[in-house]
């Protein structure tokens, strides 16, 4: 009896100790089927440190050597501001176009069966497999004033190559797979019987799309939009040929950074890159928060 009392007292003292409280507060990690959690976690942290954090820290450190006045002057010159407007504007327009047409392409690939469907599905990934420089040369050859498509458009008064329109076209070309491949698994998991049940209860096609399909696809849709937008901000190879690279007109920010590096202005290049990085990160974080909010709202609506 005394031994049981002493054991209970020891357990009570252990539970009231800091270590005991910590064990009760922290959830126990489930035993994994595959061993090596600490090794995998260590490898992940080292990878993030060497590949992500160290380069970004170096970027911020190098740009800080300019001082605040030099940094502000480097990132607010008229040439730099013009490149910001062109890069962010073209990336935003291209991502919006890809969001619309990507939804249509995904719907056709998932909901319809037709000859050549697998070929069309494979062609969606073509911009992933094609080197960006090859894509840029191909688009330039097509839409140049003497190109197959550029010559007829030129006669109609539409100039594509060496204009902001050509930049938007190139970003649209490389960004479409991000939207399609993000939406496709979500749409495949959406049961068509739910739509049929809503239609049998009197819902119109527009109501089915607006209240059933789009709310389920919206988080993935935002993710695809964000990925296409982020890819457009940093795209260089497919844009540099068709842009024309005229300062204040068709000069994109990645090209301006390369120009600064060729002029050995490393601090100025890192300053421009820092502004682009911070702005794109804030935009992507905002989109991510909006995506999480819409997912929570969509989950709470049925209850």
Residue positions per predicted region:
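Transmembrane alpha-helical segments of polytopic membrane transport and secretion proteins
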Residues: 1-44, 286-303
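Short glycine/proline-centered loop/turn elements that form peptide/ligand docking sites
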Residues: 190-194
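Membrane-water interface segments at the C-terminal ends of transmembrane alpha-helices
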Residues: 32-67, 74-188, 212-237, 241, ...
């Amino acid at each position: 009896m005394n031994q049981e009392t002493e054991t209970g007292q020891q357990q009570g003292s252990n539970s009231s100790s800091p270590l005991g409280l910590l064990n009760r507060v922290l959830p126990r990690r489930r035993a994994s089927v595959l061993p090596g959690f600490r090794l995998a976690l260590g490898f992940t942290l080292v990878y993030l440190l060497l590949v992500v954090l160290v380069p970004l820290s170096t970027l911020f450190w190098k740009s800080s050597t300019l001082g605040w006045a030099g940094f502000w002057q480097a990132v607010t010159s008229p040439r730099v501001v013009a490149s910001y407007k062109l890069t962010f504007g073209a990336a935003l327009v291209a991502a919006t176009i890809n969001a619309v047409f990507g939804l249509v392409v995904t719907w056709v690939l998932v909901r319809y069966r037709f000859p050549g469907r697998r070929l069309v599905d494979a062609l969606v990934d073509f911009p992933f497999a094609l080197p960006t420089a090859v894509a840029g040369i191909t688009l330039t050859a097509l839409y140049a004033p003497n190109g197959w498509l550029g010559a007829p458009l030129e006669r109609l008064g539409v100039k594509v190559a060496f204009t902001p329109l050509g930049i938007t076209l190139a970003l649209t070309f490389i960004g479409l797979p991000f939207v399609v491949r993000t939406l496709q698994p979500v749409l495949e998991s959406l049961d068509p019987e739910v739509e049929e049940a809503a239609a049998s209860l009197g819902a119109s096609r527009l109501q089915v799309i607006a209240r059933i399909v789009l709310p389920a696809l919206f988080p993935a849709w935002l993710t695809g939009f964000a990925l296409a937008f982020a890819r457009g901000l940093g795209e260089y190879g497919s844009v540099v040929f068709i842009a024309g690279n005229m300062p204040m007109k068709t000069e994109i920010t990645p090209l301006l950074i390369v120009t600064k590096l060729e002029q050995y202005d490393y601090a100025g290049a890192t300053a421009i890159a820092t502004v682009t990085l911070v702005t794109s990160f804030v935009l992507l974080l905002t989109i991510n928060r909006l995506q999480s909010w819409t997912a929570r709202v969509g989950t709470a609506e049925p209850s």
